[in-house]
Amino acid sequence: MSAGPVRIARTEDLAAVRRLGVACGLEDSGRSDEQIEAAWGAFAGERLVGAIALERNEGLETVNWMAVDGDYRRRGIAGRLYAALEREALVRSITRLWVTARAPAFFLSQGYTAVPEGDERDILMGECPRCAQLGRGCEPQALTKRIDDSGPPDGSRSEGETWHDRD
């Protein structure tokens, strides 16, 4: 069972990120780790209990490998991991993020919107239409979000706080 604080930190252990993702039900696309630009882990002590990666996929800056161990869910870890990724994207002057969301509600709550039919959607959906998991607990959605540091539409936030830090 989960106990104690969980810290968010950059990680270079991409194999552990993949193992956690697969253990949480994500499909390993087999893409090269060279496409991963940065990754973060959520650590309970030394144990990796959550992860997320910023990946470049055919010219799209994508969120990938977002997973949280079942014993650690509903504690705001996904939001903290995503916030770290979005802050890094801003530092890198990335203006748009993309995701193939297996859990679209989380990303929709972060301001993502559906990607219309076209090349970007085709890239994001990739092998999904042929995947054995499709329709068996997996209903992925191609989503995108324009990012900047302006905060939520009503402009409310504390000094130095990005709007998604308040989960």
State where each predicted segment sits.
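Conserved acetyl-CoA-binding loop-helix of GNAT-fold acetyltransferases
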Residues: R74-R87, V99
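Conserved GNAT acetyl-CoA-binding A-motif
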Residues: A89-R102
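Membrane-topology and secretion signals of cell-surface/extracellular proteins
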Residues: T62, L134-G135
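Conserved active-site alpha-helix within GNAT-family acetyltransferase domains
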Residues: A101-P129, Q133
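Conserved glycine-rich acetyl-CoA-binding loop
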Residues: R47, D69-R80, R92, S109
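Conserved beta-strand in the GNAT
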Residues: G41, R47-E55, L60-A67
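Short amphipathic alpha-helix that is part of the acyltransferase structural core
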Residues: M1-G30, G41-F43, E139-A142, R146-D167
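A generic "binding-loop/recognition-motif" signal
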Residues: D13, G59, R102-A103
